């Protein structure tokens, strides 16, 4: 099981592994659909696209939430099931922004109890630099049963932060 960083070489060796899922998290805040279009042209073979606004965030409510609030757990579980992720699935996430968006999905899966998730070391730019295989084929994975096992202590509220702002025991 890989749970932090994973090399392009190791990922390349598992491209045909039915127990592995590759999730492309490329995204640009100022052009939300740009990277999804790029994904349609080229991505890791067998990858699924994760749109930050649609798949990895709940709708923004002006004055109430941040830009990308966490989705409801039931919605995330449904999305992960549709992506073919079960408790036995090794997931690899990547982006082209130094891991900024891939790490969001890495954290979400870990928060929901899925430890077999790793970030592609160097992301999409390194994959291309090493001339690894790419594809334009849209992969539709078999649905799996994702069961969330929430790690409640991984999430803090704004109130928690305010209440502990000056507490030297909380870092």
Where are these regions (language model features)?
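Cytosolic catalytic domains that perform sulfur/thiol-centered chemistry
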Residues: 1-171
């Amino acid at each position: 099981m890989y749970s932090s960083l994973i090399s392009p070489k190791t990922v390349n060796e598992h491209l045909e592994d039915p127990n592995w899922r590759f999730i492309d998290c490329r995204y640009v805040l100022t052009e939300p659909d740009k990277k999804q279009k790029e994904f349609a042209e080229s991505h890791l073979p067998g990858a699924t696209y994760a749109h930050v606004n649609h798949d990895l965030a709940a709708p923004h409510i002006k004055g109430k939430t941040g830009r990308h609030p966490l989705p409801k757990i039931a919605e995330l579980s449904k999305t992960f099931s549709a992506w073919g992720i079960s408790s036995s699935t090794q997931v690899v996430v990547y982006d082209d922004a130094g891991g900024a968006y891939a790490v969001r999905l890495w954290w979400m899966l870990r928060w929901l109890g899925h430890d077999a998730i790793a970030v592609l070391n160097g992301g999409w730019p390194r994959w291309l630099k090493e001339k690894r295989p790419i594809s334009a084929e849209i992969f539709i994975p078999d649905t799996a049963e994702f069961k969330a096992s929430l790690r409640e202590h991984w999430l803090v509220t704004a109130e928690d932060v305010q209440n502990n702002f000056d507490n030297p025991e909380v870092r």
